[in-house]
Amino acid sequence: MEEHQVYLELDRSRQQDFLYPLVFREYIYGLAYGHDLNRSIFAENVGYDNKSSLLIVKRLITRMYQQNHLIISANDSKKNTFLRYNNNIYSQIISEGFAVVVEIPFSLQLSSSLEEAEILKSYNNLQSIHSIFPFFEDKFTYLNYLSDIRIPYPIHLEILVQILRYWVKDVPFFHLLRLFLYDYCNSNSLITPKKWISTFSKSNPRFFFFLYNFYVCEYESIFYFLRNKSSHLRLKSFSVFFERIFFYAKRKHLVEVVAKDFLSTLTFFKDPFIHYVRYQGKSILASKNAPLLMNKWKYYFIHLWQCHFDLWAQPGTIHINLLSEHSFHFLGYFLNVRLNRSVVRSQMLQNAFLIEMVIKKLDIIVPIIPLIRSLAKANFCNGLGNPISKPVWADSSDFDIIDRFLRICRNLSHYYNGSSKKKSLYRIKYILRLSCIKTLACKHKSTVRAFLKRLGSEKLLEEFFIEEQEIVSLIFPRASXTLQRLHRNRIWYLDILFFSNDLVNHE
C-alpha cells in the first residue's frame, strides 16, 4: 500500500477515475514482478533500453487489439507456435500489470472507510485467529444443523466486468480489461471452463485471486444485506487475517494485508439464530433452530447465484446435516458435535428411576488421511503411508537433517494438541521418525538396521518421544500438577500456523 502511494503520485480523488494511463507506467510492472524499479523488465527480455519500455507496453496492447480472434485450425497451429508463445508472454505481462492497477482503488476505499469508521481504534470488529476455536467450543455445542456450501465458480466474464464497473468509473480501462479477458479465454477455448480456470490461476495467480475474491466480496455484501433486511437484531461481524500472528501487528498492517491478498481472509458473523463462516471457497451455515430457517437461507443462496450472477445451482447439491452426525473440514481439522450419553440413577423416598443425560461436546478430529497425503506430496512417505528417505536433504549435516524433521514433528504436535483424539498423531510421528532414519542411512550409504546398530537406537532421535507434558515441565520447572492436567486435555498454541510454512519451505 505504501509503495503504491509513493510511486503513483496521484491525488486520491483522481485515482479511482483514471486507471487506464497507469497501465503504461513502467513502475507498475516493476511492482508486479518484484523487480528493481530503476531497471526495465522489458529491456531485459527484449533488448531495448529503459526509454523504450513504454513503447513496448503500448505495442503489446496494440497487438491485442489487432489480433485475429478466430480459432486457429489444427494445420496452422504448428506453424504459429511462435506467435502463440508470444501471445502468452504478452497476456502474462499485461495481467500482472492489471492486478496491480485494479487493486489501487479498492485499497484506497478500504483505508478511507476504516479511517472514517475509526475501526483501527476499536477492538470490537477485529479478532485474533486464536479466538476461532474457543468460539467453536462455546457456540457450536448449542447448534444442531449445519450446511457446508461450495461457492459456485467460475462466473461469466461479462458479469464480472459489469460488477467491477460499479466500483471503478474508468471506461477505457474496462474496455481493455474486457478485451484481455476475452482474449485469454479465446486462446484457451478448446479446454473446459474448469480447466481454463485452473490454467488461469496458475499462470496469473495474483490477478485470479483478485477477481475471485472480488466476486466473493460482492456475493457476501448482498448476503449481508438480505440478512439485515430479514432480521431486526443487531449483527456482529468479525474478520480474521491469517498473515499476522500477533494481534497488534494485524491491526497495524490491516490495509496492507487486504490489498495484497483477499484469499487468506476469513469472515464470519453471528446472531442468535444463525452463524455464518466463509473459508476456502465454502460458506458454512450453522443454526440451532429447525431446518426451516436453513432451508430459507439455502434458497436465498440459490436465487442469488442464479438471478444476480447467472450461476446454475441446484437445491439438491446443498445439504443440511445434523452436527452430531456430520463433520466438516475447517483449518486442518474435522469438526463435529459429539453426544455423550450418561445414565444417572435417582431415588426419591421408595421410588427409584433412571435419568438419561446428554452432554454435547465439540469433537475435533485429526485428519490422518489428508496428513498422510501431504507427507507423501512432500516425499516423506509413499501414498500408502510407508516412510521413505528424502535424498534432497542428504547433502545437509546430520544435525540439520534431524532439526528439520524435529521442527515439522513438533509443530504438527503443537497444532493438533487441541484435538480430541491424539493417538492418530503417533503414526505421523512414526512416519517422520523412520523417514529421518532412512535419510541419515542414505547419506551414510548404509542400511537402516546397520545405521541404528552403529549409533544406538535409544539415544538417536530421542527427541521424537518427548511428549508435550514433558516440554511444559521443561519450560515451567515449577509447574503444578494442575497445569500439567490442563495440558493433557486441550490447549490451543499461539504458533498454530508455523508448521505449514515448514512443510512448504523444506520440500
Swiss-Prot record:
Keyword annotations from UniProtKB, A to Z: Chloroplast, mRNA processing, Plastid, RNA-binding, tRNA processing
Top-level taxon of the source organism: Eukaryota
Transmembrane spans: none
Main location, first listed in the record: plastid
Gene Ontology molecular-function annotations: RNA binding
Span of the signal peptide: none
GO cellular component entries: chloroplast
GO BP field: mRNA processing; RNA splicing; tRNA processing
Subcellular location: Plastid, Chloroplast
Pfam families: Intron_maturas2 (PF01348), MatK_N (PF01824)
Function (record text): Usually encoded in the trnK tRNA gene intron. Probably assists in splicing its own and other chloroplast group II introns.
PANTHER family in the record: MATURASE K
Family, as annotated: Belongs to the intron maturase 2 family. MatK subfamily.
Record protein name field: Maturase K
Source species of the chain: Robinia pseudoacacia (Black locust)
